[in-house]
């Protein structure tokens, strides 16, 4: 056997350039300048010489790709344009490859929408000099067939990215990845490794069937799914994960549009991040929806009482009772199916034990029939024949049970039940995402209340300073989270315990700010005292430190000569002009102080406006997300009920067929035994 072209064939089979010009991977949009005609002729001769020395057939994937290129109605016979085809590849023009890829993508889309489509995992193989297993997927219809190979990690990355692209849909599950310990055990026990590979093939088939035939149409039309079935992306799946729409999704899904995560609205990047959120984990450390809904009712009441802008009815948000019941039902169903899964494992173990018993019993009966035949030799040895038939009937029974376990019990009952559990866990994952969005929504209100607290503190400072009572130290001590408030602190006493006088705030009306005017109105009507605290609404005096929202600050240009004047006044001797200088210095300091307060109030006004936009955006998203999840769960439960009914009917039918086959065997054995007894008599 010649091995001259062996490595060349392997290189051709594993080289991305096999699917076209490799320049498309570097720069798919800018063609390379064609080489001179002499170089073209030389390259053409080299290609012909290589083809003449090649004895091995072309890889299977070439037939798939060439089939896609011939699918165009305007394509001509290949022998007429062979030279032109090679020239286009050598020139570096990826036009033919692009056209072929577009044509194949259109074929995949048409194939997925074909009513006669069949999806199957036809093969699994291990890569050369590697422990990686690849699974061969076949999409076939009466007119089209596409074959592509995928690894387990590529199945998992497809599903993980579909979860991010469609956070309101339930994506079909795939089997969990094995731990390192189980991987080591599988390498030792080869038969167990084979059973795991076969199990994964069945799970992947169920995954693709549910994804294409029983899921939302959005999943079937997703470009990422089309690339998963595209042989051109077989060796460059990483490129598909770095292209739109996957590349448009932010790293943290809480900073994206929950309905369309690929939305590029810049406001989502300003949303607060909730610690502990892991979208790919099934662990949920938050309270149930019923408890969270009670907290939302409290939040709505607090907003009605303390919202300075005035509470609007469309901003009121609560969790519908349907969604709360869905969560309860999912947990209950998971518990029931988990118990059923444990019972199925015990049942399968008992069936296998019975098969082993029947094997031993059948073998012993056959040996016993031989011993009887040897002890009583003759032409009419009815006892030996009866024992042999008894053993054969035992063998038929064990074969029926073994076939039932391998072909019906495990793949058509036990594994689908386990898949239902994974489905329900995925639905709880959507509810967990919904909970974290609610927490994010509540944090926005906490941030807004903290800004209100800063607004009132600055208003108090402006009012007391303008009255000249020297109480700035008291009010400055109440601004626990405003880092810039220390610039406006003056030495004073902390003995001002009286109520605030709203007449001292008239100078703030010049700002013409709706929020500040509403704040002044509430101050005059509710008589908010200095002990009122916004962060007391949610417990703890450090909430403003934990939840903070700040926009970039542009410091105003103000006169800063007050400190120099004070130092000069301290060093100057006593004179009649000292009192006049002190009065002038105080007036300048008061003016600078008022300017600083106005600037801070304007800055807080901007932050409040931005928070109002975020709250309105998040509120709209929560209403849409709630409606989408309710619709998804209603459809999901109806599908689960149909799937469960089909599983039960199939399981009962398989059990009935097995027991009928065993009963038929034993009836035949009984009839043969009765007939032989009659003949003897």
Swiss-Prot record:
Annotated membrane topology: Peripheral membrane protein
Superkingdom assignment: Eukaryota
Family: Belongs to the sorting nexin family.
Composition bias type Low complexity, residue spans: 482-497, 558-589
Compositionally biased tracts (Polar residues): 13-24
Binding positions (a 1,2-diacyl-sn-glycero-3-phospho-(1D-myo-inositol-3-phosphate)): 151, 153, 177, 200
SUPFAM superfamilies cross-referenced by the UniProt entry: PX domain
One Gene Ontology CC term in the entry: phagophore assembly site
Cross-referenced InterPro entries: PX_dom, PX_dom_sf, PX_Snx41/Atg20, Sorting_Nexin_Autophagy
Record-linked CDD domains: PX_SNX41_42
Protein name: Sorting nexin-41
Cellular localization per UniProt: Endosome membrane; Endomembrane system
Molecular-function GO term, any one: phosphatidylinositol-3-phosphate binding
Gene: SNX41
Bias kind Acidic residues: ranges: 1-12
Major localization listed first in the record, in broad terms: membrane
Region annotated Disordered, chain positions: 1-94, 475-505, 558-597
Keyword Protein transport (UniProt): yes
A single GO BP: reticulophagy
Annotated Pfam families: PX (PF00787)
Domain PX: from-to ranges: 113-236
Description of its domains: The PX domain binds phosphatidylinositol 3-phosphate which is necessary for peripheral membrane localization to the perivacuolar punctate structures.
Keywords: Autophagy, Endosome, Lipid-binding, Membrane, Protein transport, Transport
Keyword Manganese: no
């Amino acid at each position: 056997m010649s091995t001259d072209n062996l490595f060349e064939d392997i290189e051709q089979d594993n080289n991305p350039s096999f699917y076209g010009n490799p320049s498309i991977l570097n720069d798919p949009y800018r063609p390379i300048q064609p080489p001179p005609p002499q170089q073209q002729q030389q390259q053409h001769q080299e290609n012909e010489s290589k083809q003449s020395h090649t004895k091995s057939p072309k890889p299977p994937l070439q037939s798939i790709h060439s089939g896609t290129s011939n699918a165009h109605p305007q394509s001509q016979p290949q022998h007429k344009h062979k030279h032109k085809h090679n020239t286009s590849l050598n020139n570096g023009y990826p036009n033919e490859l692009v056209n072929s890829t577009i044509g194949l993508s259109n074929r995949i889309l048409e194939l997925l929408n074909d009513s006669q489509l069949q999806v199957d995992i036809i093969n699994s193989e291990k890569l050369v000099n590697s422990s990686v297993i690849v699974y061969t997927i076949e999409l076939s219809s009466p007119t089209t067939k596409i074959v592509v190979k995928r690894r387990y990690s590529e199945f998992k990355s497809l599903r993980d990215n579909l979860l991010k692209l469609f956070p309101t849909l339930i994506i079909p599950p795939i089997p969990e990845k094995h731990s390192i310990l189980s991987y080591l055990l599988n390498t030792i026990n080869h038969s167990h490794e084979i059973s795991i590979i076969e199990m994964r093939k069945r799970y992947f088939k169920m995954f693709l069937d549910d994804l294409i035939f029983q899921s939302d149409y959005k999943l079937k039309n997703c470009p990422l799914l089309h690339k998963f079935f595209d042989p051109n992306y077989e060796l460059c799946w990483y490129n598909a994960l770095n292209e739109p729409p996957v590349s448009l999704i932010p790293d943290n899904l809480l900073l994206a549009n929950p309905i369309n995560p690929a939305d590029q609205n810049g406001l989502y990047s300003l949303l607060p991040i909730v610690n502990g959120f892991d979208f790919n984990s099934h662990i949920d450390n938050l309270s149930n929806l019923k408890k969270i809904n009670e907290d939302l009712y409290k939040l709505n009441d607090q907003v009605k009482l303390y919202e300075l802008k005035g509470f609007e009815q469309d901003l009121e948000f609560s969790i519908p009772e349907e969604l709360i019941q869905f969560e309860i039902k999912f947990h209950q169903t998971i518990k029931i199916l988990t118990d059923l899964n444990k019972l199925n494992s015990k049942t399968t173990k008992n069936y296998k034990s019975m098969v082993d018993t029947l094997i031993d019993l059948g073998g012993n009966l056959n040996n016993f029939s031989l011993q009887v035949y040897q002890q009583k030799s003759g032409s009419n040895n009815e006892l030996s024949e009866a024992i042999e038939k008894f053993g054969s009937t035992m063998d038929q029974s064990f074969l029926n049970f073994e076939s039932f376990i391998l072909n019906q019990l495990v793949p058509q009952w036990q594994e689908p039940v386990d898949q239902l559990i994974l489905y329900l866990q995925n639905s709880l994952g959507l509810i967990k995402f919904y909970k974290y969005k609610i927490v994010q929504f509540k944090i926005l209100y906490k941030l807004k209340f903290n800004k209100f607290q800063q607004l009132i503190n600055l208003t108090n400072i402006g009012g007391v300073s303008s009255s000249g009572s020297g109480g700035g130290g008291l009010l400055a001590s109440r601004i626990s989270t405003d880092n810039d408030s220390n610039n406006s602190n003056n030495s004073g006493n902390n003995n001002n315990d009286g109520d605030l006088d709203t007449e001292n705030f008239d100078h703030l009306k010049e700002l013409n700010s709706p929020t500040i005017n509403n704040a002044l109105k509430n101050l005059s009507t509710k008589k908010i005292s200095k002990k009122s605290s916004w962060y007391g609404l949610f417990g703890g005096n450090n909430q403003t430190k934990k939840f903070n929202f700040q926009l970039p600050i542009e410091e105003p240009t103000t006169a800063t000569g007050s400190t120099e004047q004070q130092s000069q006044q301290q060093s100057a001797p006593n004179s009649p002009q000292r009192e006049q200088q002190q009065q002038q210095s105080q007036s300048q300091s008061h003016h600078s102080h008022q300017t600083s307060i106005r600037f801070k109030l304007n800055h807080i006004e901007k932050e409040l406006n931005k928070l109002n936009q975020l709250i309105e955006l998040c509120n709209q998203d929560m209403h849409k997300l709630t409606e989408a999840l309710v619709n998804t769960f209603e459809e999901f439960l109806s599908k689960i009920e149909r799937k469960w009914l089909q599983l039960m009917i199939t399981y009962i039918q398989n059990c009935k067929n097995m027991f009928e086959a065993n009963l038929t065997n034993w009836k035949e054995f009984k009839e043969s035994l009765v007939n032989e007894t009659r003949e003897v008599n």
